[in-house]
Amino acid sequence: MVMLLRARCFQRLAIPDPMRVLYKDYRTATPQNFSNYESMKQDFKIEIPEYFNFAKDVLDQWTNMEKAGKRLSNPAFWWIDGNGEELRWSFEELGLLSRKFANILTEACSLQRGDRVMVILPKIPEWWLANVACLRTGTVLIPGTTQLTQKDILYRLQSSKAKCIITDDTLAPAVDAVAAKCENLHSKLIVSQHSREGWGNLKEMMKYASDSHTCVDTKHDEMMAIYFTSGTTGPPKMIGHTHSSFGLGLSVNGRFWLDLIASDVMWNTSDTGWAKSAWSSVFSPWTQGACVFAHYLPRFESTSILQTLSKFPITVFCSAPTAYRMLVQNDMSSYKFNSLKHCVSAGEPINPEVMEQWRKKTGLDIYEGYGQTETVLICGNFKGMKIKPGSMGKPSPAFDVKILDENGATLPPGQEGDIALQVLPERPFGLFTHYVDNPSKTASTLRGSFYITGDRGYMDEDGYFWFVARSDDIILSSGYRIGPFEVESALIEHPSIAESAVVSSPDPIRGEVVKAFIVLNPDYKSHDQEQLKKEIQEHVKKTTAPYKYPRKVEFIEELPKTVSGKVKRNELRKKEWVTT
């Protein structure tokens, strides 16, 4: 097996408080300030202990602090649904319930340390319990989005060799349809009010399970979770994360980008199948002792999101750019966000126009962050720093970020190249270990002493990084290199456009030209489309460099997206090049 890097191990730290694995001076009430960014980055260091388990070394320590009266009385977990149901857990209650769940995994399901558990659940409390139970037992969590089809589930079960699956009534039939083809699968748990043949009913089992359980003493570099990529350029690949790469690594997100303290209430709207849920719905807030807030909505409803932000004491809000684009289309004048103090976005670049609309309507900036399923936060806009709209910000304390050419040489400010992370001589702790069962893919990401992210960008004179495109999204037209994001940002400023995606399209003269696939706002669907195309093209010429305007425009009802919500530009691009 090709490993991306070999971690440098430290001896187990002889410290009285495991919290100090994460940082020297534990904060309960003092937010960060990045006005002195260079000093903050230079002083940051986390020593990785030989053994680390997030459930034992973080969550259980918060329980101890609760019992000692050293933590505020706000819940550790706060869940609501759309029907008026509400649930709150302290860290002590979270610990008790997760120990019961852990006993179900080890006793009823006969799972052992290192066995793999696929969890496909919506935003219900059992999803969080499953996460912590896997940590306690040393089993490997494999999250999946509830949008997976029967074919998707079969592929993931077979590829991962999962021995157990946990899901609900909606997807249980799909699992049953493929289970016979999955030779490693021997346990099925369902979250349901009803029994189902061949399945253990988790709700019933939780009633009788013991709450006495000894957490497995995991080494920091043991596999903790496997995440499937979105699969925008081929079949999904398995990304391996360890107890330190996420369990310790995501402390960077919580401490610096999210700027969380123990009194905060953090709401992240990401789907449970995304690594972003691990980022902002599990590790980052709980590292800081903050409350994880969750709202179970069967589908995204912008008015429900705004009502929740207004009604509940949410202080930190995280959502995808698409969500912000939908939210700002609402009349928000009747909503009051008295508790909200910090808003962040990640997953794809967010358009400056959307950031400005959000600021005008809420009085709050959106702090964009950049990372991958393979990493924790790579770059971010941090509190106290000047925000440059459209920029990914500056490197997080976890990484040394460079822009490289194809030979591995570092490029000067202003020149576009590959976004890369230095991995030698010392491995950064917030980075995945390898693509599981895919050594050639793992090896392909290395260029000298750097991990190549697969994204293109540049750094400006002030040290801010700017995203251009995925490497395979770059458009080469008449000698010009054009990234889709800048064109899409110009397009979204036109009032007729709800969403857009820009790809290359073949042209006999220029080789390639920019083509825009556009989803119109409802009020513009009856307009003359030829006239509207011309208006949009002229708008882009005036908004960005004229050579970047879309010479081809096609109006469509919806954009193709992955199960994690990212636009599948490769599908649109393939359509152009195969059919032309």
UniProtKB/Swiss-Prot annotation:
Q: Set out the biological process GO terms recorded for this chain's protein.
A: fatty acid biosynthetic process
Q: Which GO terms describe its molecular function?
A: 2-methylbutanoate-CoA ligase activity; ATP binding; fatty acid ligase activity; medium-chain fatty acid-CoA ligase activity; metal ion binding; propionate CoA-transferase activity; propionate-CoA ligase activity
User: Where on this chain does ATP bind?
Assistant: 229-237, 368-373, 455, 470, 566
What triggers its expression?
Answer: Up-regulated in kidney by androgens. Down-regulated in kidney by estrogens. Levels in kidney are very low in female C57BL/6 mice and in castrated male C57BL/6, 129/SvJ and BALB/c mice. Constitutively expressed in liver.
Pfam families on file: AMP-binding, AMP-binding_C
InterPro entries attached here?
AMP-bd_C, AMP-bd_C_sf, AMP-binding_CS, AMP-dep_synth/lig_dom, ANL_N_sf, Mitochondrial_ACSM
Q: For this protein, what is the EC number?
A: 6.2.1.2, 6.2.1.17
- Residues that the record marks as modified (N6-succinyllysine) are 67, 100
Gene Ontology cellular-component terms for this entry are: mitochondrial matrix; mitochondrion
Record key words, sorted: Acetylation, ATP-binding, Fatty acid metabolism, Ligase, Lipid metabolism, Magnesium, Metal-binding, Mitochondrion, Nucleotide-binding, Transit peptide
Catalysed reactions, semicolon-separated = a medium-chain fatty acid + ATP + CoA = a medium-chain fatty acyl-CoA + AMP + diphosphate; propanoate + ATP + CoA = propanoyl-CoA + AMP + diphosphate; butanoate + ATP + CoA = butanoyl-CoA + AMP + diphosphate; 2-methylpropanoate + ATP + CoA = 2-methylpropanoyl-CoA + AMP + diphosphate
Q: Where in the cell is it found?
A: Mitochondrion; Mitochondrion matrix
- Modified residue N6-acetyllysine is at which positions? 151
Query: SUPFAM superfamilies, alphabetically?
Result: Acetyl-CoA synthetase-like
Chief localization: mitochondrion
- Tissue specificity of this protein: Detected in kidney (at protein level). Detected in kidney proximal tubules and in liver. Detected at low levels in testis, stomach, heart and lung.
Where does the record say the transit peptide is? 1-21
Q: Which cofactor does it need?
A: Mg(2+); Mn(2+)
Family in the record: Belongs to the ATP-dependent AMP-binding enzyme family.
Function of this protein? Answer: Catalyzes the activation of fatty acids by CoA to produce an acyl-CoA, the first step in fatty acid metabolism. Capable of activating medium-chain fatty acids with a preference for isobutyrate among fatty acids with 2-6 carbon atoms.
This chain belongs to the protein called: Acyl-coenzyme A synthetase ACSM3, mitochondrial
State the species of origin. Mus musculus (Mouse)
Supply the gene name. Acsm3
